[in-house]
C-alpha cells in the first residue's frame, strides 16, 4: 500500500503463470497450460460411488511437488477479468470428426473441462480438506478452525458442480441431437455461481494461513506432503489446486462467448446463450466486487495497525485514497520536518513517525475533515514544490519531494474535496465579474474563527504586524493570533475570544480579530495612532508589486553587517523603493524615492552588484543572480525616469 501507490492488476493470469513456472520440467512441458493436465478424459470423476480413479499424469508420477513462494501467495491482489483470460487462454483443440458442428465442439470442451474441474474439487474437498480436518481433530496439533478457513466454502462449490452442474451438462450433451442448446441450462444454474465470491474473497487469507501453518506445524506439512506426492494430486501442491476455483468463472465466460460466436445467426439458442453469458459476467463482477471490498477493508485495517489502534478508521464508509511522506514547513524552525499523511475520502490524518517503532509506526497529530477543506499551491522560492492544506481544524504548509509529487497530492486532495461537496450538494456558482476579489475577501472575514488560519512564519516578519514595533527576544516576543495567523506582540495579542474551529474554547487573538469576533470597540489609544510614511505593508507577492525580492545591502549606509533586505517597488507607489527587514513586515525601515536617481554598475569584480546614485547619496545592492540584477536595474531605471504602469500587469518584473 504505497502513497500515491501501486496499481493492482486486473487478472489472475499473472499468478497462474507463476504457478506454471514453479512446476518441474517433468511435471509439465514448457508452454503447457495447467488446464491441459487437468482436463484429460482419464481425470473424470466416477459416475457412481466407489473408489476414485487415479489420475494418469504420465511422467509426472513420483516427481517431487514444488511449492509456490510465500511472497506470491501473500501478494494476490488480482481481479477476475474475462478480457485478460481471452488473451491468455485459447480453446482446447478437440479430436473428433471434422464434420461435427463447431458449437457442439465448444459444448464438448465445456463438459470435458467440467469433468476435470470436478475431479480437482473432489481432491480439494474429499481428500485435502477431510484429511487435514481428521488430523486436526485427532492430534490437536493445529486448530480445526484454521483448516475450515483455508478451504472456505469449497464443500458447497463441490456439491453444486458434482451433483447439479456436471450432470445437467452431461444430460444435455447426450440429448444434443434432439435438443441442441446449452444456454437454458447455464441460465438456470448461473445464479449459484455467486457463491464463488466468498471463496475468492477468502483466497488471500487462506494462502497466508496455509503458508504459516506449513512452516509452523510439522504434522500439517506431513499431511500435505503425503497427499501432494500421490498420483491423484499430479505432483501439484495444494496451492495450485486451490487456485482452480478462482480461474473457473472466467473460463466459463470465455467458452460461452466462443459458443455464441459459433452459433448460426438464427439459432434457437442465441437468446438464451446471450442471457447466460450476461449472468456469468454478473457472477464474475460479483466476485470482483467482493475482492475490492475485501482489499479496501484490509487496507484500512493495515493503516489501523500502523497507527497503533489509536484512531477509529475501520469504518465501511472510509476509503484510503493516498498515503505517503511529506515535509511540514514550520512557522518557527527553518528546516522542514518529516511527516506522514493518510488521505481518506472524508478526512486527513496528519501523523508523526515514531522514533521507537514498537507496535505503531505513526502517531496521529491532527485529524482534519475533508468537508470545508481547501488546497492551493504556495509560490515560495525558499520551499519549492510546497502547497497549503487549509481545513477547519488546522492549516498545514507542506512540501513535496518534486513538482510531480506535489501535483499528485493536490489532485488527490481536490478529488476528495469535489466528491464530498457533490455528495453534500454544496456546489455554488463561482463569483463572477469584477467583484470577485471583494467577495472572496468578505468570505474570508466571515470565516474568521470558523477555520484554522495559515500562520505567518516567524522569520517572515521582524516587527508586530499590528503595531509595527520591532521584536526582540527579551521585551517583545513573537505570538500568533489564533484567528488570523498574524505574528503580533504580547500587547497586541492580549485578548481572548472563543473560536468555533477549536470547539468554542477561548484563544489568544489580536486586537483586530477580538473586535471582529466579539463586537467590542477597540481602545482609543489604538484607534488614534497616526500612520507613518514608512508604515506601508510589504507587497510580498508579485501581483502586488512591480518588482520584489531579497537584495544584499552593502556599505556604511546600511551598517557594517551588510544585512539582507526585502526590497519592493509597489504597484500602487511605482516610483518608490521600500526596503523591509522581512517579507511580511508592516513597516519599511527605509524608503527611497527613485525619481532622478542614476542606476550604475557596481565596483568591478562582482557582476551581481549595482548602485543607486544621486548627488551625495549612494546605495549599493547585490542580487543573488545576474539575471535578477538585470531585472532590478531595468525596474529602477524605469522608476528613475518617471515611468509608471498604465494598467495592472504592465511592466511586471517580479519573481
Curated annotation (Swiss-Prot):
Alphabetically, the GO molecular function entries are: guanyl-nucleotide exchange factor activity; phosphatidylinositol phosphate binding; small GTPase binding; zinc ion binding
Q: Which InterPro entries match?
A: DBL_dom_sf, DH_dom, FGD1-4_PH2, FGD2_PH1, FYVE_RhoGEF_PH, PH-like_dom_sf, PH_domain, SOS1_NGEF_PH
- Gene3D superfamilies linked to this entry: Dbl homology (DH) domain (1.20.900.10), Pleckstrin-homology domain (PH domain)/Phosphotyrosine-binding domain (PTB) (2.30.29.30), Zinc/RING finger domain, C3HC4 (zinc finger) (3.30.40.10)
What Gene Ontology terms describe where this protein resides (cellular component)? cytoplasm; cytoskeleton; cytosol; early endosome membrane; Golgi apparatus; lamellipodium; nucleus; ruffle
Region feature (Disordered): 18-64
Provide the PH domain boundaries: 319-418, 544-641
Main location group: cytoplasm
A GO biological process this protein is involved in?
A: filopodium assembly
Q: Where does Zn(2+) 2 bind?
A: 481, 484, 510, 513
| One Pfam family in the UniProt entry | FYVE
- Which UniProt key words apply to this protein? Cell membrane, Cell projection, Cytoplasm, Cytoskeleton, Endosome, Guanine-nucleotide releasing factor, Membrane, Metal-binding, Nucleus, Phosphoprotein, Repeat, Zinc, Zinc-finger
Q: Where is the composition biased (Basic and acidic residues)?
A: 32-56
Location(s), subcellular: Cytoplasm, Cytoskeleton; Cytoplasm; Nucleus; Early endosome
As stated in the Swiss-Prot or TrEMBL entry, residues carrying the post-translational modification Phosphoserine are 11, 48, 654
- Would the keyword Iron-sulfur be found if you checked this record's keyword annotation? no
Q: Which CDD domains match?
A: FYVE_FGD1_2_4, PH1_FGD2, PH2_FGD1-4, RhoGEF
Q: What is known of its domains?
A: The FYVE-type zinc-finger is necessary for early endosome localization. Recruitment to endosomal membranes via this domain requires the presence of phosphatidylinositol 3-phosphate or other phosphatidylinositides.
Described function: Activates CDC42, a member of the Ras-like family of Rho- and Rac proteins, by exchanging bound GDP for free GTP. Activates JNK1 via CDC42 but not RAC1. Binds to phosphatidylinositol 4,5-bisphosphate, phosphatidylinositol 3,4,5-trisphosphate, phosphatidylinositol 5-monophosphate, phosphatidylinositol 4-monophosphate and phosphatidylinositol 3-monophosphate.
Name the UniProt record assigns to this protein: FYVE, RhoGEF and PH domain-containing protein 2
Q: Which organism is it from?
A: Homo sapiens (Human)
By which gene is this protein encoded?
FGD2
